[in-house]
UniProtKB/Swiss-Prot annotation:
<dbReference type="Pfam" id="PF00750">
    <property type="entry name" value="tRNA-synt_1d"/>
</dbReference>
<dbReference type="InterPro" id="IPR036695">
    <property type="entry name" value="Arg-tRNA-synth_N_sf"/>
</dbReference>
<comment type="subunit">
    <text>Monomer.</text>
</comment>
<dbReference type="InterPro" id="IPR014729">
    <property type="entry name" value="Rossmann-like_a/b/a_fold"/>
</dbReference>
<keyword id="KW-0648">Protein biosynthesis</keyword>
<dbReference type="GO" id="GO:0005737">
    <property type="term" value="C:cytoplasm"/>
</dbReference>
<keyword id="KW-0963">Cytoplasm</keyword>
<keyword id="KW-0067">ATP-binding</keyword>
<dbReference type="Pfam" id="PF05746">
    <property type="entry name" value="DALR_1"/>
</dbReference>
<dbReference type="InterPro" id="IPR001412">
    <property type="entry name" value="aa-tRNA-synth_I_CS"/>
</dbReference>
<dbReference type="Pfam" id="PF03485">
    <property type="entry name" value="Arg_tRNA_synt_N"/>
</dbReference>
<keyword id="KW-0030">Aminoacyl-tRNA synthetase</keyword>
<keyword id="KW-0436">Ligase</keyword>
<dbReference type="InterPro" id="IPR035684">
    <property type="entry name" value="ArgRS_core"/>
</dbReference>
<feature type="short sequence motif" description="'HIGH' region">
    <location>
        <begin position="139"/>
        <end position="149"/>
    </location>
</feature>
<dbReference type="GO" id="GO:0006420">
    <property type="term" value="P:arginyl-tRNA aminoacylation"/>
</dbReference>
<dbReference type="GO" id="GO:0005524">
    <property type="term" value="F:ATP binding"/>
</dbReference>
Length: 594
């Protein structure tokens, strides 16, 4: 049922419970606390549309038989005039469950709601005015984005859309880890290529990156090419293979630009890119360390500076500054999260790989140790597990482009139908290939809970049948578009006929099930936002597509009689809108033809 209907029914049941309690206890116990009214959809459709266990909750405190209580609650409910528009029938099941059947009109109301709200259907302003910073991808600028980054990008962008649908002002942020040992390895790798070396040659650095992209960076550097990230200053290659600092700057700018291209092909945008290096140049890391020392949260031992993370629940204290004077991985992270707090983001969510689990307690301990008002549990985390790529029944572990892993660009190209092994820049691929590949990759990577490992099957992504989940959902949308076009063409009809259509002919089991599924969408979005679980939207879309196919296969839509024809078209039009809305939440297109 729709949220407003659910609220009304909860209020009616609450009033009924109050009447029953009043009759049982009178005013003798003013401290008696009424149980919360919880409405659920029965797992078995034959049991009704809504179930409530409030009678079972009341039985013990009232010392009454739960079935008898349920009967009294139902009697009080149906006696209220407002219930007549919602409740068609009520029955008591088992030890005292209240099962309610909703009126056909209350189920049909979702169609009018969808028409009235259009693309806004499902959205809510319940979190209006609240700001949230969502950090995701945050790759090192040392190579192309891999499939793990792809999962973060898909999850993060979808979650941002879901949160925005609930009224949040969402700030999307990418944190570039551009300071550290890996950046040094990138520089010496590019320098080695610039000097004519390749992996396996004598003199090839042991820690060097072996992917072909390093050769591309070295070539463009020596050719004096100019590169720039979307938010960065242009950097021109100096053509000097001995200038390691110039090589480093060029390589970082080159790979940031490449990652920008990957994200553009993936349809992901950020509001801000934050550079780790700025934390050092602006003195934020030193300031944070000094503040922790002043707060008594650190101690010196064996030449290293330790943070008392055990004070905040960690299993042991952690080294902050090593004996060589460099900082461990989590120290700039603490400084970075201080900037998030100082920028006014009281709600922060980080999407990271599960290999970052160990840093959570350290970062939170550092933030708590500063005593600047940051609440415990700040920031929130969504941790995702690894992605395995399969093709032709075999795991794909490497690509020519990256050398040691499958890239996001590989997945987009392969899932769009490009020939495996081809090296084509996203801007040179046709738009249909990019869209098809992007849709498949995004939907697939969101279609499982983040904390479960995911097997990405290229062969499945290319299938054009109901085995392919994104095809199954998109085909439902395209099929409806085809029927709507045929309706307009054959009968000279227009969409203007639909909002005021008589919906009473929608009385079949399949029609009722489809309308109930449509009405669930607002709750699905609210749940996805509350639980930071965008996969719930993907699950829902598959269920909605299934209900549509069941309805479409059971009932002819374009029948001769106008009333049932228009009613069924109205139901299809509402279903099309909700499919489009849900796909948009995931960043997936809703094609009108397939």
């Amino acid at each position: 049922m729709l949220p407003a209907q659910k609220h009304t029914l909860e209020t009616l049941l609450e009033n009924s419970v109050k009447q029953v309690v009043q009759a049982s206890k009178g005013d003798a116990d003013a401290a008696f606390v009424l149980p919360a009214i919880a409405l659920e959809r029965p797992k078995v459709a034959a049991h009704g549309d809504v179930a409530c266990n409030v009678a079972l909750q009341l039985a013990k405190p009232l010392g009454a038989n739960p079935r008898q209580l349920a009967e009294r609650i139902v009697a009080a409910l149906t006696a209220q005039p407002a219930a007549a528009g919602l409740v068609d029938a009520a029955e008591i099941a088992g030890p005292g469950f209240i099962n309610l059947r909703l009126t056909p009109a209350s189920k049909q109301a979702v169609i009018g709601a969808v028409f009235a709200q259009g693309r806004a259907f499902g959205a809510s302003e319940r979190e209006h005015g609240k700001r949230v910073l969502l950090e995701f991808v945050s790759a090192n600028p040392t190579g192309p984005l891999h499939v793990g980054h792809g999962r973060q990008a898909a999850l993060g962008d979808a979650l941002a859309n879901v949160l925005a649908s609930q009224g949040y002002a969402v700030h999307r942020e990418f944190y570039y880890n551009d300071a550290g040992v890996q950046i040094g390895n990138l520089a010496i790798s590019t320098q080695a290529r610039a000097r004519g070396l390749k992996p396996g040659d004598a003199g090839w650095p042991e820690a060097a990156y072996n992917g072909e992209y390093i050769a591309d960076i070295a070539r463009d550097y020596l050719n004096g090419e100019t590169v720039a990230a979307s938010d960065g200053e242009p950097v021109t290659g100096k053509r000097d293979a001995d200038d390691l600092e110039a090589i480093r700057k060029f390589a970082v700018a080159y790979l940031r630009r490449e990652q920008d291209m990957d994200l553009k092909a993936f349809g992901v945008k950020f509001d801000q890119y934050y550079l780790e290096s700025s934390l050092y140049t602006e003195g934020r890391v030193e300031k944070t360390v000094d503040a922790l020392i002043a707060a008594g949260m650190t101690y010196e031992q064996e030449g290293a500076l330790w943070l008392r993370t055990t004070d905040e629940g960690d299993d042991k204290d952690r080294v902050m500054r090593k004996t060589d004077g460099t900082y461990t991985y989590f120290v700039p992270d603490v400084a970075y999260h201080v900037t998030k707090w100082e920028r006014g983001f009281t709600k922060v969510i980080n999407i990271q790989g599960s290999d970052h689990h160990g840093t959570i307690a350290r970062v939170r301990a550092g933030l708590q140790g500063l005593h600047i008002g940051i609440p415990k549990g700040y920031p929130d985390y969504v941790l995702h597990k690894m992605v395995t790529v399969m093709r032709d029944g075999q795991e794909v572990k490497i690509s020519k482009r990256a050398g040691s892993y499958v890239t996001v660009r590989d997945l987009i190209e392969w899932s769009g139908g490009a020939t495996p092994g081809s090296e084509v820049s996203p801007e040179l691929l046709d738009e249909a290939t990019i869209t098809r590949g992007r849709d498949a990759v995004r939907f697939f990577l969101i279609s499982r809970k983040a904390d479960t490992e995911f097997v990405f099957d290229i062969d499945l992504a290319l299938k054009q049948n109901d085995e392919n989940p994104v095809y199954y959902v998109q085909y439902a949308h395209a099929r409806i578009c085809s029927v709507l076009n045929e309706w307009k063409s054959r009968y000279g009809a227009t969409d203007a006929l639909l909002p005021g259509a008589d919906l009473s002919p929608l009385d079949s089991k399949q029609a009722m099930a489809l309308m109930q599924k449509l009405a669930e969408y607002p709750d699905v979005l609210a749940h996805a936002a509350n639980e930071l679980a965008p996969h719930a939207v993907a699950f829902y879309l598959r269920e909605l597509a299934s209900e549509f196919h069941s309805f479409y296969n059971a009932e002819r839509v374009l029948v001769d009689e106008e009333a049932p024809r228009t009613a069924r078209i109205a139901l299809l039009a509402a279903t099309r809108q909700v499919l489009e809305n849900g796909l948009a939440m995931l960043g997936v297109s809703a094609p009108s033809k397939m």
